[in-house]
């Protein structure tokens, strides 16, 4: 019976073993091109072969831009310089292993040096710009700051550009994923105060994946 098959399948899964695999894979920064990412691939390959699977590692050259320098400063009415770093978390030894860690950025972000007034655009989605227009707020020539959420991150800088903005900052609002939701990690599941999201803002409708891959 399907239920019996499902029960036998569930019994073959060890949550302790899976937890060990996840901790091993996440023990070091493991983004594309990172040494630990390669180690994870080789470890997974060895595991698959041990299970009797016909497996191999395929190698692809992909376009993966990383910045040489990232900075964010407020210049008026008072000066503030963002640290753009994630502090080690007490109780989590892996959080201090930052040798191969990516900086606080999103892949395919714009390159340049921009200084302009700042405009808050909520989530930076179409309805938010309509609301700003009704209030007489123009983002042309401004830097917009938008919350993560309510839409894919890549839409936020694109919509900002479409409305004439010269820059876009995306941040994680604690109201959405922080202490208002749960206790911060490691006590709870919420994002730590210094946690930074990373990802891509490539134009997915135009490039649904690696821009160099047919």
Which residue ranges define each predicted feature?
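Internal hydrophobic scaffold segments of catalytic domains
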Residues: 55-57, 61-81, 161-193
């Amino acid at each position: 019976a399907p239920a019996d098959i499902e029960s036998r399948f569930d019994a073959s899964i060890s949550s302790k073993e899976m937890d060990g695999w996840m901790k091993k894979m996440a023990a070091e920064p493991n983004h594309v091109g990172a040494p630990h990412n390669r180690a994870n691939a080789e470890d997974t390959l060895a595991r698959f072969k041990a299970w009797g699977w016909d497996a191999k590692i395929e190698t692809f050259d992909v376009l993966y831009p990383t910045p040489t320098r990232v900075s964010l400063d407020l210049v008026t009415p008072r000066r503030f310089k963002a640290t753009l770093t994630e502090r080690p978390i007490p109780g989590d030894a892996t959080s201090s292993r930052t040798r191969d860690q990516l900086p606080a950025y999103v892949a395919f972000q714009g390159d340049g040096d921009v200084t302009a007034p700042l405009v808050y655009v909520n989530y930076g989605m179409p309805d938010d710009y309509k609301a700003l227009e009704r209030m007489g707020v123009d983002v042309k020539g401004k830097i917009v700051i938008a919350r993560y959420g309510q839409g894919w991150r890549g839409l936020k800088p694109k919509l900002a550009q479409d409305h004439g903005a010269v820059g876009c900052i995306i941040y994680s609002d604690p109201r959405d994923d922080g202490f208002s939701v749960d206790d911060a990690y490691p006590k709870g599941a919420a994002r730590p105060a210094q946690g930074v999201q990373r990802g891509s803002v490539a134009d997915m409708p135009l490039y649904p994946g690696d821009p160099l891959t047919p």
